[in-house]
Amino acid sequence: MKLVGITIGLKSEDESLWVNGIKLNAAMLYLLINKIDGYKAILVDTSGKVKDYSKIKMWDTSTFITKDFYKVANDLDVLIQLSTSFSDQDINLFKQDGFNAKIVKYNCGNNYVIEMERIIFDDPEKSPPMTWSQSCDQVWYIPQQHKHNHDYYSIVHNTDALVVPFVWDPYFIDLRKKQLEETGNNTVDYSHTSSTIDAKRIMSFEPNNNVIKFSMPLIMIVEHALRIGASFKDYKVCSGQRMFKNKAFLEAISSLEIYKHGKIKYLGRYPIVDILTTDVDFVISHQWDNPLNYLYLDVMYLGYPLIHNAHMIKDAGYYYDDFNFKEGAHILKEALQKHDSNLLEYAEKNKTVLERYTNKNFGMVETYKKLLDNLFEPGKHELSYKYNWKTNDYE
Protein backbone atom coordinates (compact mmCIF):
# COMPACT_ATOMS: atom_id res chain seq x y z
CA MET A 1 0.00 0.00 0.00
CA LYS A 2 1.55 3.30 -1.11
CA LEU A 3 0.84 6.40 0.96
CA VAL A 4 -0.16 9.57 -0.92
CA GLY A 5 -0.06 12.93 0.86
CA ILE A 6 -2.14 15.78 -0.56
CA THR A 7 -1.06 19.21 0.65
CA ILE A 8 -3.35 21.73 2.29
CA GLY A 9 -2.56 24.90 4.22
CA LEU A 10 -4.91 25.47 7.15
CA LYS A 11 -5.21 29.00 8.53
CA SER A 12 -6.84 27.91 11.80
CA GLU A 13 -8.91 25.16 13.40
CA ASP A 14 -12.05 27.23 12.67
CA GLU A 15 -11.44 27.72 8.94
CA SER A 16 -14.48 27.13 6.75
CA LEU A 17 -14.35 24.70 3.85
CA TRP A 18 -16.33 27.17 1.71
CA VAL A 19 -13.86 30.08 1.79
CA ASN A 20 -12.37 29.02 -1.56
CA GLY A 21 -12.29 25.98 -3.78
CA ILE A 22 -8.75 24.75 -3.19
CA LYS A 23 -9.51 22.77 0.00
CA LEU A 24 -12.47 21.22 -1.80
CA ASN A 25 -10.12 20.20 -4.62
CA ALA A 26 -7.91 18.45 -2.09
CA ALA A 27 -10.84 16.69 -0.43
CA MET A 28 -12.29 15.49 -3.75
CA LEU A 29 -8.94 14.08 -4.83
CA TYR A 30 -8.57 12.43 -1.41
CA LEU A 31 -11.91 10.63 -1.84
CA LEU A 32 -10.94 9.44 -5.31
CA ILE A 33 -7.48 8.13 -4.43
CA ASN A 34 -8.89 6.18 -1.51
CA LYS A 35 -10.98 4.25 -4.06
CA ILE A 36 -7.83 3.09 -5.88
CA ASP A 37 -6.39 -0.33 -5.06
CA GLY A 38 -2.86 -0.16 -3.71
CA TYR A 39 -2.99 3.50 -2.65
CA LYS A 40 -4.05 5.31 0.50
CA ALA A 41 -4.44 9.11 0.67
CA ILE A 42 -4.04 11.43 3.61
CA LEU A 43 -4.27 15.23 3.78
CA VAL A 44 -1.04 16.85 4.92
CA ASP A 45 -1.14 20.33 6.42
CA THR A 46 1.91 22.46 5.73
CA SER A 47 0.88 25.53 7.75
CA GLY A 48 2.16 24.62 11.21
CA LYS A 49 -0.79 26.60 12.64
CA VAL A 50 -2.93 23.73 13.93
CA LYS A 51 -2.03 21.93 17.14
CA ASP A 52 -4.93 19.47 17.39
CA TYR A 53 -6.33 18.20 14.10
CA SER A 54 -9.29 16.53 15.82
CA LYS A 55 -10.64 20.04 16.47
CA ILE A 56 -10.68 21.38 12.92
CA LYS A 57 -14.16 22.28 11.68
CA MET A 58 -13.49 22.00 7.97
CA TRP A 59 -14.29 18.28 7.86
CA ASP A 60 -14.62 15.17 10.02
CA THR A 61 -11.03 14.02 10.51
CA SER A 62 -12.15 10.45 11.12
CA THR A 63 -13.17 10.44 7.44
CA PHE A 64 -10.61 12.91 6.09
CA ILE A 65 -7.38 11.86 7.77
CA THR A 66 -5.38 15.06 8.29
CA LYS A 67 -1.78 15.14 9.53
CA ASP A 68 1.03 17.61 10.06
CA PHE A 69 3.16 17.30 6.92
CA TYR A 70 6.42 17.73 8.80
CA LYS A 71 5.63 14.74 11.04
CA VAL A 72 4.72 12.32 8.23
CA ALA A 73 6.81 13.54 5.27
CA ASN A 74 9.25 10.65 5.36
CA ASP A 75 6.40 8.11 5.36
CA LEU A 76 5.01 9.33 2.05
CA ASP A 77 5.45 7.51 -1.24
CA VAL A 78 3.81 10.31 -3.24
CA LEU A 79 3.48 13.99 -2.39
CA ILE A 80 0.79 15.81 -4.36
CA GLN A 81 1.40 19.53 -4.00
CA LEU A 82 -2.09 20.93 -4.39
CA SER A 83 -3.12 23.60 -1.90
CA THR A 84 0.46 24.50 -0.99
CA SER A 85 3.76 24.04 -2.79
CA PHE A 86 7.40 23.90 -1.76
CA SER A 87 10.44 25.58 -3.27
CA ASP A 88 13.40 23.62 -4.59
CA GLN A 89 15.32 24.69 -1.51
CA ASP A 90 12.62 23.24 0.75
CA ILE A 91 12.58 19.94 -1.13
CA ASN A 92 16.36 19.63 -0.93
CA LEU A 93 16.21 20.15 2.83
CA PHE A 94 13.48 17.51 3.16
CA LYS A 95 15.57 15.04 1.14
CA GLN A 96 18.53 15.58 3.43
CA ASP A 97 16.25 14.50 6.27
CA GLY A 98 15.10 11.30 4.54
CA PHE A 99 12.21 12.45 2.33
CA ASN A 100 12.07 10.31 -0.82
CA ALA A 101 8.54 10.62 -2.23
CA LYS A 102 7.57 11.08 -5.85
CA ILE A 103 6.42 14.67 -6.27
CA VAL A 104 3.42 15.76 -8.34
CA LYS A 105 2.41 19.40 -8.76
CA TYR A 106 -1.38 19.32 -9.10
CA ASN A 107 -2.79 22.55 -10.51
CA CYS A 108 -6.47 23.36 -10.01
CA GLY A 109 -6.59 27.04 -10.94
CA ASN A 110 -5.65 29.00 -14.04
CA ASN A 111 -2.19 29.79 -12.73
CA TYR A 112 -1.04 31.61 -15.85
CA VAL A 113 -3.77 34.23 -15.56
CA ILE A 114 -3.59 34.40 -11.76
CA GLU A 115 0.18 34.87 -11.73
CA MET A 116 0.25 37.36 -14.58
CA GLU A 117 -2.46 39.47 -12.92
CA ARG A 118 -0.46 39.31 -9.70
CA ILE A 119 2.63 40.66 -11.47
CA ILE A 120 0.68 43.43 -13.20
CA PHE A 121 -1.67 44.58 -10.44
CA ASP A 122 -0.42 43.51 -6.99
CA ASP A 123 1.67 45.61 -4.65
CA PRO A 124 5.15 44.16 -5.34
CA GLU A 125 6.00 44.36 -1.64
CA LYS A 126 2.92 42.35 -0.60
CA SER A 127 2.47 39.94 -3.49
CA PRO A 128 2.77 36.27 -2.41
CA PRO A 129 5.58 34.23 -3.94
CA MET A 130 5.18 32.27 -7.16
CA THR A 131 6.68 28.83 -6.60
CA TRP A 132 8.28 27.72 -9.86
CA SER A 133 9.79 24.60 -8.38
CA GLN A 134 11.74 22.28 -10.68
CA SER A 135 11.77 19.44 -8.16
CA CYS A 136 8.52 17.88 -9.43
CA ASP A 137 8.47 14.50 -11.12
CA GLN A 138 5.35 15.53 -13.03
CA VAL A 139 2.83 18.35 -13.27
CA TRP A 140 -0.84 17.39 -13.43
CA TYR A 141 -3.50 19.92 -14.34
CA ILE A 142 -7.25 19.76 -14.79
CA PRO A 143 -8.71 19.98 -18.32
CA GLN A 144 -10.13 23.50 -18.25
CA GLN A 145 -6.58 24.87 -17.83
CA HIS A 146 -5.16 23.35 -20.98
CA LYS A 147 -5.49 26.32 -23.35
CA HIS A 148 -3.55 28.80 -21.21
CA ASN A 149 -1.33 26.59 -19.11
CA HIS A 150 -0.01 23.43 -20.79
CA ASP A 151 3.25 24.85 -22.10
CA TYR A 152 3.51 27.36 -19.26
CA TYR A 153 3.54 24.58 -16.64
CA SER A 154 5.94 22.42 -18.59
CA ILE A 155 8.46 25.24 -19.00
CA VAL A 156 8.35 26.80 -15.52
CA HIS A 157 8.54 23.39 -13.81
CA ASN A 158 10.87 21.85 -16.43
CA THR A 159 9.00 18.56 -16.57
CA ASP A 160 6.06 16.83 -18.25
CA ALA A 161 2.73 18.65 -17.83
CA LEU A 162 -0.15 16.19 -18.10
CA VAL A 163 -3.86 16.93 -18.33
CA VAL A 164 -5.81 14.71 -15.90
CA PRO A 165 -9.54 14.04 -15.52
CA PHE A 166 -11.61 16.48 -13.47
CA VAL A 167 -12.67 15.12 -10.07
CA TRP A 168 -15.87 16.08 -8.25
CA ASP A 169 -17.98 14.50 -5.53
CA PRO A 170 -21.30 15.59 -3.97
CA TYR A 171 -20.10 14.53 -0.49
CA PHE A 172 -19.98 18.02 1.04
CA ILE A 173 -23.10 19.24 -0.75
CA ASP A 174 -25.03 16.28 0.69
CA LEU A 175 -23.55 16.87 4.13
CA ARG A 176 -24.39 20.59 4.21
CA LYS A 177 -27.86 19.94 2.78
CA LYS A 178 -28.54 17.42 5.56
CA GLN A 179 -27.29 19.84 8.23
CA LEU A 180 -29.59 22.61 6.99
CA GLU A 181 -32.62 20.36 6.74
CA GLU A 182 -32.04 18.99 10.25
CA THR A 183 -32.08 22.54 11.64
CA GLY A 184 -35.49 23.26 10.13
CA ASN A 185 -34.55 24.97 6.88
CA ASN A 186 -36.45 24.29 3.69
CA THR A 187 -35.43 21.28 1.67
CA VAL A 188 -32.60 22.31 -0.64
CA ASP A 189 -33.91 21.61 -4.11
CA TYR A 190 -35.58 23.46 -6.93
CA SER A 191 -39.09 22.24 -6.05
CA HIS A 192 -39.14 24.63 -3.08
CA THR A 193 -38.53 27.79 -5.14
CA SER A 194 -40.87 30.43 -6.54
CA SER A 195 -43.56 29.02 -8.80
CA THR A 196 -44.61 31.94 -11.02
CA ILE A 197 -42.35 33.28 -13.77
CA ASP A 198 -42.46 36.91 -12.68
CA ALA A 199 -41.35 35.87 -9.18
CA LYS A 200 -38.25 34.00 -10.35
CA ARG A 201 -35.01 35.15 -8.73
CA ILE A 202 -31.76 34.97 -10.69
CA MET A 203 -28.34 34.81 -9.05
CA SER A 204 -24.71 34.51 -10.09
CA PHE A 205 -21.90 33.14 -7.93
CA GLU A 206 -18.78 34.32 -9.75
CA PRO A 207 -16.25 35.48 -7.11
CA ASN A 208 -15.33 38.61 -9.12
CA ASN A 209 -11.67 38.24 -8.22
CA ASN A 210 -10.23 38.18 -11.74
CA VAL A 211 -11.22 38.46 -15.39
CA ILE A 212 -11.98 34.74 -15.67
CA LYS A 213 -14.79 34.71 -13.10
CA PHE A 214 -16.40 38.14 -13.40
CA SER A 215 -20.05 39.19 -13.42
CA MET A 216 -20.05 41.88 -16.10
CA PRO A 217 -20.96 39.41 -18.88
CA LEU A 218 -23.89 38.24 -16.76
CA ILE A 219 -25.10 41.79 -16.24
CA MET A 220 -25.11 42.13 -20.03
CA ILE A 221 -27.08 38.90 -20.43
CA VAL A 222 -29.70 39.76 -17.82
CA GLU A 223 -30.04 43.30 -19.19
CA HIS A 224 -30.68 42.05 -22.71
CA ALA A 225 -33.07 39.39 -21.42
CA LEU A 226 -35.15 42.13 -19.80
CA ARG A 227 -35.08 44.17 -23.02
CA ILE A 228 -36.45 41.25 -25.05
CA GLY A 229 -39.29 40.65 -22.64
CA ALA A 230 -38.02 38.17 -20.05
CA SER A 231 -39.99 38.26 -16.82
CA PHE A 232 -38.26 37.79 -13.45
CA LYS A 233 -38.19 39.34 -9.98
CA ASP A 234 -34.54 40.35 -9.64
CA TYR A 235 -30.90 39.49 -10.33
CA LYS A 236 -28.49 39.25 -7.39
CA VAL A 237 -24.71 39.38 -7.82
CA CYS A 238 -22.91 37.35 -5.15
CA SER A 239 -19.45 38.58 -4.12
CA GLY A 240 -20.45 41.94 -5.56
CA GLN A 241 -19.48 44.30 -2.74
CA ARG A 242 -16.30 45.57 -4.38
CA MET A 243 -17.98 46.12 -7.75
CA PHE A 244 -20.87 48.06 -6.28
CA LYS A 245 -18.52 50.34 -4.35
CA ASN A 246 -16.77 51.30 -7.59
CA LYS A 247 -18.00 54.73 -8.72
CA ALA A 248 -17.16 54.16 -12.39
CA PHE A 249 -19.02 50.83 -12.38
CA LEU A 250 -22.13 52.36 -10.79
CA GLU A 251 -22.12 55.25 -13.25
CA ALA A 252 -21.85 52.79 -16.13
CA ILE A 253 -24.69 50.49 -15.10
CA SER A 254 -26.99 53.38 -14.15
CA SER A 255 -28.06 53.53 -17.80
CA LEU A 256 -29.25 49.91 -17.78
CA GLU A 257 -32.88 48.89 -17.45
CA ILE A 258 -32.14 46.39 -14.70
CA TYR A 259 -30.65 49.24 -12.66
CA LYS A 260 -33.42 51.75 -13.40
CA HIS A 261 -36.09 49.22 -12.39
CA GLY A 262 -34.24 48.14 -9.25
CA LYS A 263 -33.77 44.58 -10.46
CA ILE A 264 -30.01 44.31 -9.89
CA LYS A 265 -28.71 43.85 -6.34
CA TYR A 266 -25.55 42.57 -4.71
CA LEU A 267 -24.70 40.23 -1.86
CA GLY A 268 -21.58 39.02 -0.08
CA ARG A 269 -20.08 35.57 -0.52
CA TYR A 270 -22.04 32.61 0.84
CA PRO A 271 -21.78 28.81 0.80
CA ILE A 272 -23.82 27.86 -2.23
CA VAL A 273 -26.08 25.39 -0.42
CA ASP A 274 -27.02 27.95 2.23
CA ILE A 275 -28.05 30.67 -0.21
CA LEU A 276 -29.95 28.27 -2.47
CA THR A 277 -32.33 27.48 0.40
CA THR A 278 -33.60 31.04 0.63
CA ASP A 279 -32.86 33.33 -2.26
CA VAL A 280 -32.45 31.65 -5.66
CA ASP A 281 -34.51 30.07 -8.43
CA PHE A 282 -32.17 30.33 -11.44
CA VAL A 283 -28.37 30.41 -11.52
CA ILE A 284 -26.56 32.11 -14.37
CA SER A 285 -22.83 31.80 -14.99
CA HIS A 286 -20.15 33.09 -17.33
CA GLN A 287 -16.49 32.16 -17.01
CA TRP A 288 -13.75 32.91 -19.52
CA ASP A 289 -12.05 29.73 -20.78
CA ASN A 290 -13.07 27.84 -17.63
CA PRO A 291 -15.42 25.16 -18.94
CA LEU A 292 -15.42 23.01 -15.77
CA ASN A 293 -16.08 24.25 -12.27
CA TYR A 294 -17.55 22.88 -9.03
CA LEU A 295 -20.16 25.65 -9.16
CA TYR A 296 -21.77 24.22 -12.29
CA LEU A 297 -21.89 20.68 -10.95
CA ASP A 298 -23.12 21.66 -7.48
CA VAL A 299 -25.98 23.75 -8.88
CA MET A 300 -27.14 21.04 -11.27
CA TYR A 301 -26.78 18.31 -8.63
CA LEU A 302 -29.24 20.22 -6.44
CA GLY A 303 -31.67 20.41 -9.36
CA TYR A 304 -31.45 24.12 -10.08
CA PRO A 305 -31.55 25.48 -13.63
CA LEU A 306 -28.08 26.61 -14.71
CA ILE A 307 -27.54 28.94 -17.67
CA HIS A 308 -23.85 28.72 -18.57
CA ASN A 309 -21.14 28.99 -21.25
CA ALA A 310 -19.08 25.96 -20.15
CA HIS A 311 -18.54 23.96 -23.33
CA MET A 312 -17.24 20.86 -21.52
CA ILE A 313 -20.73 20.41 -20.05
CA LYS A 314 -22.69 21.74 -23.01
CA ASP A 315 -24.77 18.55 -22.78
CA ALA A 316 -26.15 19.67 -19.39
CA GLY A 317 -27.96 22.70 -18.05
CA TYR A 318 -28.81 25.51 -20.49
CA TYR A 319 -25.78 26.28 -22.65
CA TYR A 320 -24.89 29.42 -24.58
CA ASP A 321 -21.65 29.89 -26.47
CA ASP A 322 -18.62 31.81 -25.24
CA PHE A 323 -19.18 35.61 -25.14
CA ASN A 324 -22.47 35.54 -27.05
CA PHE A 325 -24.42 37.59 -24.52
CA LYS A 326 -27.51 37.98 -26.69
CA GLU A 327 -27.68 34.23 -27.19
CA GLY A 328 -27.35 33.85 -23.42
CA ALA A 329 -30.24 36.28 -22.94
CA HIS A 330 -32.50 34.29 -25.25
CA ILE A 331 -31.50 31.04 -23.50
CA LEU A 332 -32.29 32.64 -20.12
CA LYS A 333 -35.67 33.92 -21.30
CA GLU A 334 -36.63 30.51 -22.71
CA ALA A 335 -35.48 28.71 -19.54
CA LEU A 336 -37.53 31.08 -17.37
CA GLN A 337 -40.59 30.29 -19.46
CA LYS A 338 -40.21 26.53 -19.90
CA HIS A 339 -38.04 25.05 -17.13
CA ASP A 340 -40.85 24.22 -14.72
CA SER A 341 -42.52 21.98 -17.30
CA ASN A 342 -39.27 20.12 -17.96
CA LEU A 343 -38.00 19.17 -14.50
CA LEU A 344 -37.74 15.38 -14.88
CA GLU A 345 -35.95 15.49 -18.23
CA TYR A 346 -33.57 18.18 -16.92
CA ALA A 347 -32.70 16.10 -13.84
CA GLU A 348 -32.12 12.89 -15.79
CA LYS A 349 -29.88 14.60 -18.36
CA ASN A 350 -27.79 16.26 -15.67
CA LYS A 351 -27.45 13.07 -13.61
CA THR A 352 -25.74 11.29 -16.49
CA VAL A 353 -23.31 14.17 -16.98
CA LEU A 354 -22.50 14.57 -13.28
CA GLU A 355 -21.54 10.92 -12.83
CA ARG A 356 -18.64 11.19 -15.27
CA TYR A 357 -16.76 13.35 -12.71
CA THR A 358 -17.30 11.03 -9.72
CA ASN A 359 -15.80 7.71 -8.68
CA LYS A 360 -18.79 6.06 -10.38
CA ASN A 361 -16.81 6.66 -13.56
CA PHE A 362 -14.64 3.57 -13.25
CA GLY A 363 -12.61 4.51 -16.31
CA MET A 364 -11.54 7.74 -14.63
CA VAL A 365 -10.62 5.92 -11.41
CA GLU A 366 -8.53 3.44 -13.38
CA THR A 367 -6.79 6.30 -15.22
CA TYR A 368 -5.70 7.84 -11.92
CA LYS A 369 -4.35 4.45 -10.82
CA LYS A 370 -2.32 4.25 -14.02
CA LEU A 371 -1.02 7.79 -13.52
CA LEU A 372 0.15 6.91 -10.02
CA ASP A 373 1.63 3.59 -11.14
CA ASN A 374 3.60 5.33 -13.89
CA LEU A 375 5.34 7.53 -11.33
CA PHE A 376 7.10 4.43 -10.01
CA GLU A 377 7.36 2.45 -13.26
CA PRO A 378 7.46 4.95 -16.15
CA GLY A 379 5.72 3.56 -19.20
CA LYS A 380 4.02 0.71 -17.30
CA HIS A 381 0.68 1.90 -18.66
CA GLU A 382 0.35 3.46 -22.08
CA LEU A 383 -1.84 6.56 -21.86
CA SER A 384 -2.81 8.94 -24.67
CA TYR A 385 -3.11 12.05 -22.46
CA LYS A 386 -5.72 13.24 -24.98
CA TYR A 387 -8.65 14.43 -22.91
CA ASN A 388 -12.22 13.70 -24.06
CA TRP A 389 -14.70 15.97 -22.27
CA LYS A 390 -17.62 13.69 -23.11
CA THR A 391 -16.16 10.88 -20.97
CA ASN A 392 -13.93 12.91 -18.62
CA ASP A 393 -11.14 10.49 -19.49
CA TYR A 394 -8.43 9.91 -22.06
CA GLU A 395 -9.32 8.81 -25.56
Predicted regions and their residues:
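A short, active-site helix/loop in glycosyltransferases that binds the activated sugar's phosphate group
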Residues: 116-188, 361-362
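A charged, aromatic-enriched C-terminal amphipathic alpha-helix characteristic of glycosyltransferases
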Residues: 339-395
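Conserved catalytic-core segment of nucleotide-activated headgroup transferases in glycan assembly
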Residues: 18-25, 151, 157-258, 262-263
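A short, charged/proline- and glycine-enriched loop
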Residues: 1-5, 9-10, 75, 193-202
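Extended catalytic core of nucleotide-activated donor transferases of GT-like folds
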Residues: 10-12, 27-137, 141, 145-150, ...
